[in-house]
Amino acid sequence: MAGEIPDLIAEARTGTGKGAARQARREGNVPGIVYGGGIDPLAINIPFNVLLKRLKDGRFLSTLFNMKVEGQDDVRVICRNVQRDVVKDLPTHVDFMRLKRTSKIALFIPVEVIGEEECPGLKKGGVLTMVRPEVELRVTAGDIPEQITIDLTGLEIGDTVTISSVELPAGAKATIDRDFVIANLTAPSGLVSAESEEDEDAPAADEVPATEVSEE
């Protein structure tokens, strides 16, 4: 489960629009905006290297931050969008939404897999296919889970893991009502091909196999 909320330090940006944003980038910052919470949006700058490191650390879009801006009250935020340069794939603008610790928000949470060593299907050569490596959950902003876990113990080839078989963290709920598939165990391609060839060689249901008839 989520632990201590990390700080994210930014500075208020004077001026808005494309000109101010370009100036921020020239000075080694990434321009951004903080909105929501029933108060006016706040234009900010975040040091490029700080933001890039956070992005490389992973889970940036599902991490609740305590944003510190000089002259402003600390506020809990979550990133809702990171715009990137289409060529260099580097961040050029970032949007944050203000949240209360008790706010509910929909986030994609990574799926962790355990129990591979106790999975008969994998031991027989089965292949695990992750249909949903991440699952969208509605969670409390102050208690965002790091991942949800699926257990392969005892599963055979042909079995599936659905959301109903997963123990979700307290307060979390899937955003999709139906019992969707997260992963499945399929037969290895070689075995599937062999079975297909056997099916082709077998007589059709409405055919009678030819038999030798002895003449009397």
Curated annotation (Swiss-Prot):
GO biological process, one term: translation
Transmembrane segments: none
InterPro entries: Rbsml_bL25/Gln-tRNA_synth_N (IPR020056), Ribosomal_bL25/Gln-tRNA_synth (IPR011035), Ribosomal_bL25_b-dom (IPR020057), Ribosomal_bL25_C (IPR037121), Ribosomal_bL25_long (IPR001021), Ribosomal_L25_dom (IPR029751), Ribosomal_uL5_bac-type (IPR020930)
GO molecular function, one term: structural constituent of ribosome
GO annotations of cellular component type: cytosolic large ribosomal subunit
Protein origin, superkingdom: Bacteria
Biased composition (Acidic residues): 195-204
Region Disordered: start-end pairs: 191-216
Oligomeric and partner information: Part of the 50S ribosomal subunit; part of the 5S rRNA/L5/L18/L25 subcomplex. Contacts the 5S rRNA. Binds to the 5S rRNA independently of L5 and L18.
Known role: This is one of the proteins that binds to the 5S RNA in the ribosome where it forms part of the central protuberance.
HAMAP family (UniProt xref): Ribosomal_bL25_CTC
UniProt protein name: Large ribosomal subunit protein bL25
Organism name: Jannaschia sp. (strain CCS1)
